[in-house]
Amino acid sequence: MKKCIVQYWIPSSEYTHPGYNNLLKNSNKFDADGFANRSARSFELYANKYNHDFVRVTEKKLNYKHPTFERFDLWLDDHWWEKYDEIMYVDSDVFAMPEAPDIFQHYKSLGTFKVCEHDAFQKATLPEQIDLIHHGLLKKCKLDEVKHYGFQPGVFILTKTARDIMRPYIEQFKELNDHDGHILIWACIQSQVPLTRMSRYYNYKKAYFKGHPESYFFHAAGHKKLVHLGRIYDFLEKKGLQ
């Protein structure tokens, strides 16, 4: 079966809580549409290079609060899995570097949920570090499980097997009073889905700073992207990502 790379880009204005997540929003200082289009082009090229499908979802389906919840459809709609046995989700502020290897060939397991290493979870030891990860819905879970399963949800690979294991918990998303990232981690913990830990270079935040190693996928995550926007654009252009 084929592999697929999926992005979502739907105007938040079409939802009941458009300000729920303002990390990628048009303003007089930031062309979010242009930024997201550049991300999509990078993954379309990446998918074509390795003969995978690329799908950009631009119409709402779940229609719950904000477009960030739309990715739960990957668990809920059986039609995805009639054609694919693996789907990689990527945020619309993630960019595939031209020389990035084929992630599906790098991590071949079809029985696990594949997420990137994330030190904020795996290496949290100080009280202030633990407070950042062990709250909300996750406060109901054991800290060791939160540290083990925790990940940054801007990049992940969902296999059909993992989808089937996690689905009963993802189905509860409207009943869970927390953000989508916590719901994903909670579903991992509750389902005890087997994990594959992928290299952080497939979800790397500060690639545009000098001295940082070459990454495979650059994630311009968080509000700091607006502070460093010029530097980010320079970095992308040097990589040939227009």
Protein language model features and the residues they cover:
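Catalytic phosphate/metal-binding cores of nucleic-acid and nucleotide-processing enzymes, i.e., regions
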Residues: 57-58, 93, 143
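Charged, glycine/proline-rich intrinsically disordered loops and linkers
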Residues: 15-32, 123-143
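Catalytic core and acceptor-binding pocket of nucleotide-sugar-dependent glycosyltransferases
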Residues: 146-241
